[in-house]
Design a protein with these regions (language model features):
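Conserved beta-strand signature within the Rossmann-like core of class I S-adenosyl-L-methionine
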Residues: 99-105
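Conserved SAM/SAH cofactor-binding pocket of Class I
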Residues: 1-64, 70
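Short conserved AdoMet
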Residues: 20, 97, 121
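Short beta->alpha hinge that forms the Motif I/post-I loop of the SAM-binding pocket
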Residues: 29-33, 84, 107
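Conserved class I S-adenosyl-L-methionine
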Residues: 108-119
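Core SAM-dependent methyltransferase catalytic element
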Residues: 121, 128-139
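A short SAM/SAH-binding and catalytic strip from SAM-dependent methyltransferases
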Residues: 69-79
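A short glycine-rich, Lys/Arg-flanked "PGG" loop and its adjoining helix->strand segment in the class I
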Residues: 86-98
Length: 139
C-alpha cells in the first residue's frame, strides 16, 4: 500500500482508481465544487480516501507521500498561469518520502522538464504521444 496524493483531484476519477487498488489516497483541489465531487465519487464507489480543499500544498503541512500524481492546471480563465504547477513541482520534495515519486501528465508544450530537473534532480518521460507527456521524477 502506498500513501498517494492526488493533486488537483477534480471529480476523483484518479483517486478512485488508486483507492480501488488499495492505496491510501489523499485528494486535494482548490475548488470546493471539485472536492465535493471527489468525495461523492469515492462514496458512490464505496472507497476510502481523504479529500481536502487546498491551494496546492496549503492544507498538507508536514504531510509526506510515497507518490504525488497530478495533471496540473495551467489555465486561469483564458490566460495561461504556471503558478500552481510551479508550486506543485518546486515544493514536491518537501512532501515526498525518501524515494518518493512525482508523476505528472501534461501537455507536451508546457515547460515542466526544466523545473523537474531543478526541483528533483532529474526525471524520465514515461509516455509521449506528441500531444501529452507523462513525467516521473524520483526524490
Amino acid at each position: 500500500t502506498l500513501k498517494v496524493l492526488d493533486m488537483g483531484c477534480g471529480d476523483g476519477i484518479i483517486s478512485a482508481w488508486l483507492a480501488k487498488r488499495g492505496h491510501a489516497v489523499t485528494a486535494v483541489d482548490v475548488s470546493a465544487f471539485a472536492a465535493e465531487a471527489c468525495r461523492r465519487t469515492l462514496h458512490d464507489n464505496a472507497l476510502d480516501g481523504t479529500v481536502l480543499e487546498s491551494d496546492v500544498y496549503s492544507a498538507l503541512e508536514g504531510e509526506r507521500f510515497d507518490v504525488i500524481v497530478s495533471n496540473p492546471p495551467f489555465h486561469q480563465e483564458r490566460d495561461i498561469s504556471y503558478g500552481p504547477s510551479t508550486r506543485l513541482i518546486d515544493e514536491a520534495p518537501e512532501h515526498l518520502n525518501a524515494k518518493g515519486q512525482l508523476i505528472l501528465v501534461a501537455n507536451a508544450f508546457l515547460p515542466y522538464p526544466e523545473r523537474l530537473q531543478r526541483a528533483l534532480g532529474g526525471f524520465e518521460t514515461l509516455s509521449d504521444n506528441r500531444r501529452f507527456r507523462v513525467y516521473r521524477a524520483t526524490k
